[in-house]
């Protein structure tokens, strides 16, 4: 069952709907359309989901749309439907507060980019992450190598309507880690007490990819164009086999730290979004954390789930496998919160 805002339902109602005739096809058994996604916390919607015996799987949209209207305490308490995973861990995805993602990374001893508390402290190239002015649940990014460049770029982006002064005041400033990016999409099974690597992917970002494709002879024409790093999709990728062991060790340390700081800790899918630094030796630097189902449906096309299960397994199917296993062993309480 899919919960969606009106105007976005056609994909699920027409194209992905489950039908039997003349041949079986589709995967969506039902759709609940709401005027806005935040209405999912309405009592009547909650009871409708409960009547359908739903197990809710949160994605990024669930967080960001509800956060426009509710705080995390309200989300955790008013959501009556059982969550697959740890509903109390969602708030740690934020970059503020005493128990945010950085606290878990520090507890786990996972290397992450150095942070600067003010533009005046900038040393070398930094990435600035701030709320987008027009799409508040998305982030706007820009690069700067000095406090002067920070001020100039920020002023231009405010004038262009990309940032606001208030949003910039709470921006995260961190060193820019050089290297290719890779999202390590893990799945922790409390039933098996094992960590799995579901797959790996990397982001496609506008208009960064356009800049990469421009020949050097034409770069002068782009001097007045601001580079954007807003997400547009994902591409399946792989990492060197020699880096799999460090990746698993990083994931295992994260699971242990999350269990200590946000019990019961990680349940099911989470991702450590990393840069592979040049070294030598090469090292994974975690610049972001995802604490729910990943945004990339293409991770099944990397080889790692097949190494474990003998065939490609999507994240959605792996969640279903865990729920069925928990149901059949009377352990649903270990995977639902």
PLM feature segments, named:
Residues 235-337:
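ATP-dependent carboxylate activation and anion-phosphoryl transfer catalytic cores
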Residues 33-44, 67-73, 98-99, 150-157, ...:
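Well-ordered, non-membrane alpha-helical segments in soluble/globular domains
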Residues 101-102, 129, 201, 287-292:
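Active-site ExK catalytic segment of metal-dependent nucleases
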Residues 2-7:
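Short internal beta-strands
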Residues 8-123, 133-134:
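Conserved N-proximal alpha/beta basic substrate-recognition cap immediately N-terminal to
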Residues 13-32, 209-247:
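Charged, glycine/proline-rich intrinsically disordered loops and linkers
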Residues 147-227, 242-246, 250-266, 271-285:
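Phosphate-binding site of ATP-dependent enzymes
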Residues 105, 115, 123-144, 161-179, ...:
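ATP-grasp fold ATP-binding core
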